[in-house]
UniProtKB/Swiss-Prot annotation:
Binding site for orotate: F34, F35, T128, R156
Pathway assignment: Pyrimidine metabolism; UMP biosynthesis via de novo pathway; UMP from orotate: step 1/2
Cofactor: Mg(2+)
Gene: pyrE
Lineage, broadest ranks: Bacteria, Pseudomonadati, Pseudomonadota, Gammaproteobacteria, Vibrionales
Cellular component terms per the entry's GO annotation: cytoplasm
Annotated binding of 5-phospho-alpha-D-ribose 1-diphosphate, by residue: 26, 72-73, 99-100, 103, 105, 124-132
InterPro entries (alphabetical): OPRT, Or_phspho_trans_dom, PRibTrfase_dom, PRTase-like
GO terms classed as biological process: 'de novo' pyrimidine nucleobase biosynthetic process; 'de novo' UMP biosynthetic process; pyrimidine nucleotide biosynthetic process; pyrimidine ribonucleoside biosynthetic process
Keyword Magnesium: yes
Native source species: Vibrio cholerae serotype O1 (strain ATCC 39315 / El Tor Inaba N16961)
PANTHER family in the cross-refs: OROTATE PHOSPHORIBOSYLTRANSFERASE 1-RELATED
Subunit structure: Homodimer.
Protein name according to UniProt: Orotate phosphoribosyltransferase
Amino acid sequence: MKAYQREFIEFALEKQVLKFGEFTLKSGRKSPYFFNAGLFNTGRDLARLGRFYAAALVDSGIEFDVLFGPAYKGIPIATTTAVALADHHDVDTPYCFNRKEAKNHGEGGNLVGSKLEGRVMLVDDVITAGTAIRESMELIQANKADLAGVLVAIDRQEKGKGELSAIQEVERDFGCAVISIVSLTDLITYLEQQGNNTEHLEAVKAYRAQYGI
């Protein structure tokens, strides 16, 4: 686990974006942890979040031409990631996002920002069912662009309805890499290294044994 990944986990815990306990997911599964990126909700939080996304992007080595943030949660993520790339990595990246409803006046259309062209890096908070990715792919293909990859905050590394995770299904269906700032494996490593969260560690390990990929 790299320094920025450890710092991200500590940041998420500090902001209660990441919590350990018992939580019922939409799928009905009882999870020993919960991640709610919506709680990164101040200017300082957003600035820090962008730095972690930018670090993961640079670390991945994936080449791309434009950042795309799917409405709604992806919009501030794409924006802050673009700012962090410029401020901390001297990379001036175009970014754009979509409207949920197309507009017929003014600039019109359903895209805001730069053109959606070339190799597109899609940024979002998490992938649960992959629905947002599939909707975004329609836009990307309609603009004759290519999906270079997808970056999310956390990879839960758990099976969906079948044997694959939602992220693995996206990788299979669209032939692109999906990267994350941290993964379930990183959370377990963090808990092991802390050494003072035995109860949470055992619960997360048991969850991985049951649902992990």
